[in-house]
């Protein structure tokens, strides 16, 4: 796949690449398919970052994920918390892959004098989101549960977890 990515970048000569690509999913998908989340996300980042470098792309912006920070990080999360504790087990493979992308940008910057960066968006949701109960993220799953419960006149909704995590969300 790197050849296709490299050829696309070579042919189109972008000044900036913003990497929003990734294999994503909810708790169930992350638990059941950790190798796919790890391998596919590392491949996406490696292919894009390496091809950007080889084709002299000046600006590369990588989207990270808040899940790269330790499970027990204090709120609000600070960049300095990275790699200071254990990751959440339910999405550890995805988190490790996103850490690899962040570190790749740092290493390309130091070794090759690039200015690649990683930004951490909050949880995004909106039109065309994934509402599959086995693969969706927290907010689309919650929205679907509310709608389904309303249809069936149910008075309660099951939400996984302890209720303690804090999340930032943005409608897109």
Region locations from a protein language model:
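NAD(P)H-binding glycine-rich loop region in Rossmannoid oxidoreductase-like domains
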Residues: 1-41
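Conserved mid-core alpha-helix of short-chain dehydrogenase/reductase
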Residues: 4, 43, 47-51, 104, ...
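Catalytic Tyr-X3-Lys loop
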Residues: 14, 34-46, 50-53, 57, ...
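Conserved Rossmann-fold NAD(P)-dependent oxidoreductase catalytic core, especially the SDR/UDP-sugar
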Residues: 19, 46-91, 117
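Active-site loop/turn elements of alpha/beta-hydrolase fold enzymes
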Residues: 22, 65, 121-124
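NAD(P)-dependent short-chain dehydrogenase/reductase
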Residues: 72-81, 103-172
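Active-site helix of classical SDR
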Residues: 93, 97-100
């Amino acid at each position: 796949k790197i050849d296709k990515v490299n050829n696309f970048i070579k042919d189109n000569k972008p000044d900036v690449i913003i990497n929003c690509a990734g294999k994503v999913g909810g708790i169930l998908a992350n638990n059941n398919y950790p190798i796919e989340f790890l391998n596919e996300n590392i491949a996406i980042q490696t292919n894009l970052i390496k091809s950007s470098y080889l084709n002299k792309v000046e600006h590369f912006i990588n989207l990270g994920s808040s899940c790269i920070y330790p499970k027990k990080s204090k709120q609000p999360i600070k960049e300095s918390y990275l790699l200071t504790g254990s990751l959440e087990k339910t999405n550890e493979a995805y988190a490790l892959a996103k850490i690899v992308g962040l570190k790749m940008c740092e290493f390309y910057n130091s070794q090759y004098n690039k200015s690649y960066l990683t930004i951490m968006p909050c949880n995004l949701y909106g039109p065309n989101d994934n509402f599959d109960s086995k693969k969706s993220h927290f907010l689309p799953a919650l929205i679907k549960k509310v709608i389904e419960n309303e249809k069936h006149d149910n008075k309660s909704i099951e939400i996984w977890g302890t209720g303690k995590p804090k999340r930032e969300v943005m409608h897109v």
